[in-house]
Amino acid sequence: MTHQTHAYHMVNPSPWPLTGALSALLMTSGLIMWFHFNSMYLLMLGLTTNTLTMYQWWRDIVRESTFQGHHTPIVQKGLRYGMILFIVSEVFFFAGFFWAFYHSSLAPTPELGGCWPPTGITPLNPMEVPLLNTSVLLASGVSITWAHHSLMEGNRKHMLQALFITISLGVYFTLLQASEYYETPFTISDGIYGSTFFMATGFHGLHVIIGSTFLIVCFMRQLKFHFTSNHHFGFEAAAWYWHFVDVVWLFLYVSIYWWGS
C-alpha cells in the first residue's frame, strides 16, 4: 500500500464476507426450524451473527474512508454506482408486489365476489392514518434535503437539527404504521387482499426502519465530525435511500390505500 501508484482501494483481507455467509445460512436454516419445529434458537443465532457482521463490516468501511483516506474520488464514484444499482434492484423488488396487487384488483375473480376490495373485506379509510403517514414522510423528505444542503454549506448545527427531525419523523411513521396494523379489520391470511396489503406495506415499513437506522448512524458520525462538505458519501447514500422509501410510499398510498379502497 505504501508504493501505490493509483487511486483505487485495494481492500485488505477481511473475515466478514465469510461470517456474513455463515450467518445467512444460519438465518435461512433457522427459518425452516421455526416454520417446521417451532424453534427459534437457530434463527436468533443467525440474526445475532448477521447483526454483528454488519456492524463490524461497516465499522471497517468507516475506518477506511474517514481515518485511512482510502475513499478517493474515484472510489466514491464506484460506491455511488453501487448504491444506485442497489436502489434499482429495490425498485424491481417492490414492482413485484405492485404487479401482484394490480393483477388481482384489475380483474377480480369470482372467488373474490367479482369486485375489489373482495367481498367481506373492510378497507382502511385513506383519509385518516394513511394520509397522516403520507404527510409525515413528505415532511421527512424536506428535512433530509435541508440536512444535505446544510452539510454542503458547512453548517453543522443545522445539519444535525434537520437530521434529528428526519429521524424523529421516521420513528413516528413506524409507530403510526404499527398502530394501524393493530387496528386493521383484516389479516395477512385474508386472501389476496390481505397478503398483498401486508406484504407491500410491511416490506415498506421494514425499509423505513432500515433507513432510520442508516440516518441514526449518520447522526452519530456527524457528532464525531466524520463528514465534510466534499466527503460525505455515507450520508448521501442514506439520503438517496430515504428518498426512495418516500417515493415508494406515495405509490403505495395511491395504489393500495386510495384507489384500492
Curated annotation (Swiss-Prot):
Stretches in topological domain Mitochondrial intermembrane: 35-40, 106-128, 184-190, 257-261
Catalytic function, reaction form: 4 Fe(II)-[cytochrome c] + O2 + 8 H(+)(in) = 4 Fe(III)-[cytochrome c] + 2 H2O + 4 H(+)(out)
Known role: Component of the cytochrome c oxidase, the last enzyme in the mitochondrial electron transport chain which drives oxidative phosphorylation. The respiratory chain contains 3 multisubunit complexes succinate dehydrogenase (complex II, CII), ubiquinol-cytochrome c oxidoreductase (cytochrome b-c1 complex, complex III, CIII) and cytochrome c oxidase (complex IV, CIV), that cooperate to transfer electrons derived from NADH and succinate to molecular oxygen, creating an electrochemical gradient over the inner membrane that drives transmembrane transport and the ATP synthase.
SUPFAM superfamilies: Cytochrome c oxidase subunit III-like
Upper classification of the organism: Eukaryota, Metazoa, Chordata, Craniata, Vertebrata
TM annotation in the entry: 16-34, 41-66, 73-105, 129-152, 156-183, 191-223, 233-256
Predominant subcellular localization, coarse grouping: mitochondrion
Membrane topology, from the record: Multi-pass membrane protein
Subunit structure: Component of the cytochrome c oxidase (complex IV, CIV), a multisubunit enzyme composed of 14 subunits. The complex is composed of a catalytic core of 3 subunits MT-CO1, MT-CO2 and MT-CO3, encoded in the mitochondrial DNA, and 11 supernumerary subunits COX4I, COX5A, COX5B, COX6A, COX6B, COX6C, COX7A, COX7B, COX7C, COX8 and NDUFA4, which are encoded in the nuclear genome.
Family membership: Belongs to the cytochrome c oxidase subunit 3 family.
One example GO MF annotation: cytochrome-c oxidase activity
E.C. designation(s): 7.1.1.9
InterPro entries referenced in this protein's UniProt entry, alphabetically: Cyt_c/ubiquinol_Oxase_su3 (IPR024791), Cyt_c_oxase_su3_dom (IPR033945), Cyt_c_oxidase-like_su3 (IPR000298), Cyt_c_oxidase_su3-like_sf (IPR035973), Cyt_c_oxidase_su3_a-hlx (IPR013833)
Matching CDD domains: Cyt_c_Oxidase_III (cd01665)
GO CC annotation terms, alphabetical: mitochondrial inner membrane; respiratory chain complex IV
Listed PROSITE patterns: COX3
Pfam families xref list: COX3
Topological region Mitochondrial matrix: 1-15, 67-72, 153-155, 224-232
Protein name: Cytochrome c oxidase subunit 3
EC category name: translocase
Source species of the chain: Halichoerus grypus (Gray seal)
Compartment(s) where it occurs, according to its Swiss-Prot or TrEMBL record: Mitochondrion inner membrane
